[in-house]
Amino acid sequence: MTGLINPSGFVLACPGSGKSFLVKREIADVFLRNANADILVIDPEREYWKLAEAFNGTVVKFSNGSKSYINPFDFDIALLDDEEVDVIADKCQLITSFISCMDSKHPLNAQEKSFVDRCVRKAYIRSGVLDTLDPADMPTLETFLDCMKKETENINKDMKDKLIVTIDMYVNGSAKYFNNRTNIDTDNRFISYDIRDLNGNLKTQSMLLILDYIWNRLSRNRDLGRATYIYFDEAHLLFADEYALDYLRMLWKRARKYGGVLTGITQNVEDLLKDDKSRSMLSNSEYLALLKQNPTDAAKLQDILHFTDSEIQYVNDTPPGHGILVLGGKDKIPFYDEFPRDTELYSKITTNFSETAKMLEAKAE
């Protein structure tokens, strides 16, 4: 993929078609071949921990009861000197997306977005971090909530009270997990962010915050001359929310300049295709790995990607591991991923339940 103008892309497949195996095989290949690359995985289903541990990576588990935290307001101080980035504006967009995910059925209107934007900016000013440049002075959701409560200029009281009630749950209520300072270790070159134990909107919000946190890693790695490979499984969770999708698109556009390669992985192709923004991300991706698709999705993909009838057959009713690569938007390469099963690496990347059970049984003997 190094020869592609923008190597970010997608892995799309039905359940049981070899999607996770293909991705983990690629991760292993990147890790072993490129010592100057970091690998970061957002793992909603706890599928990557064995591979991470095999390579002495770090698995960071997020849940309501865990002690691993990411502060939504955190950012790399060095970004303040980056002329290509308005880090505070980006944070305003992130927090707007974060709040939108709290109730995706009722997106923020223009007045609410303006209010949130104003309070985010005031939270950074009030915390003092823009003067001290000390990460310990970063604002938190509690700082943000306090700014909301004290804001009185040109405010609709009903709107303000509604947002305060919503945010209060994330500061003092059941979702206060997000009202903490970042404390995770990110020095390892292979990190898997495990969010399986988070449910519903909390999972989507965590994916959003982790992507933003990874953006900080991208910034540091660019200065170090290191590549950053980012894999986010269950990508359709981000497509369901307009603001989360907008934030993802922003990262997608910037990643290449920072040495980043983003790979979205999903079995819900329909969610990817139903929105013009995500369809645009798909059609403009220079790397696509397609395995078995259901007939409806295959027909839609054929239309968007201009497959011939013979080319689309490589994803119609095919065995696991069979598919087609689309590189540079035009080159289509059929593949069959046949991996030797009597190896230690295979045991770390297979997701076949019966095979895993047999391996555990043999190990016990």
For the regions a language model picked out, list residue spans one by one.
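Glycine-rich phosphate-binding loop of nucleotide-binding enzymes
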Residues: M1-N64
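P-loop NTPase motor domains
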Residues: T2, R46-T58, N64-S66, N71-G260, ...
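Charge-patterned, long linear interaction tracts outside catalytic cores
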Residues: L4-G9, A13, E26, V116-K149, ...
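Short acidic loop-to-helix transition motifs that present clustered carboxylates
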Residues: I5, R46, V269-L272, P295-T296
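C-terminal regions of RecA-like/P-loop NTPase motor modules
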Residues: C14-P15, L272-E365
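Hydrophobic "anchor" residues on beta-strands that sit immediately upstream
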Residues: I39, Y229, T263
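H-loop/switch region of ABC-family ATPase nucleotide-binding domains
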Residues: T266
